[in-house]
Amino acid sequence: MSYRMSRSRVFGALGAAGLLALPACSSGTHPPAAVTTSAPAASAGTTSPAAPVTSVRIGRFTQEFATPLPADQAQAKIIEGWREAQILWSKSLIAWRLVPGVTGYVTGVARTHLLGAISYGKQNDAVPAGADRMFMTSVTSVAPTAATITTCDDGSRFAEVNPKTGTVNQAFATPADHQYLYETWHMVPVGGHWAIGSFTLATLPAAAARHCQP
C-alpha cells in the first residue's frame, strides 16, 4: 500500500473515520522513478517463484508490483492506472507536496488522505524508505464508471526516515500484525484512464488479511 505516512498513524486516522482504509526523500524535489523488472527470490506470499517483479525506485523508497498485468486489456488498463497512482502518491510523500500528475490519478476521499499523509510527514520530518511489495493483485469488478482492485501488501521492509539524515525513525516502526495487509482499491475513470477514488484495508485478526500473511 503505498499510501504512506506512519502505518500506525494511518490506521488510527482511518479507524477514527470508520474506514480502516488506505493507499502510496528530499524536500521540494523528486527524482525520476527508476523502473526495473526482475525475477524475485522465493518469499512468502509470492504467486509464483518465476513471476516477474516490477520495481519502481523513488528516492530511498522502492515500490514493487509482484503480480504481472492481466492478459485482459481492459483489466490491464485498470491495474496500470492503479500502479501510476501508487507511484505518484509515493513521490508526493517524498516531495511533501502534490507532484505534477497526481491529482489526475488520486481523487476524492483518497486525495484527502494523501494530503493528510503529506502534512503528517512534513510535520514529523518523515519520508518513505525501504521497500513495499504488492502481490496477489487482481481486478475483482469492472463497470463503466467504477472498478475494484484487491491486493495483498507486504510492508515488512518499509521504513520512514528523516530526509536530511537518512536516520530511520523507530517511533514509526510498523507493528508485526500490520506488516501484511489486505487492501481494496476503488477505481474511477478520469480523463481517459483509471484513478484511485477511495480504499479500505484489513489487518490481522480480520479474516480477509489472513491469506496475505507469510
What are the language-model segments listed below?
Residues 21-24:
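C-terminal motif of bacterial Sec signal peptides marking the signal peptidase cleavage site
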Residues 26-29:
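Bacterial signal peptide processing site
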Residues 53-130:
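Core segments of small alpha/beta cavity-forming domains
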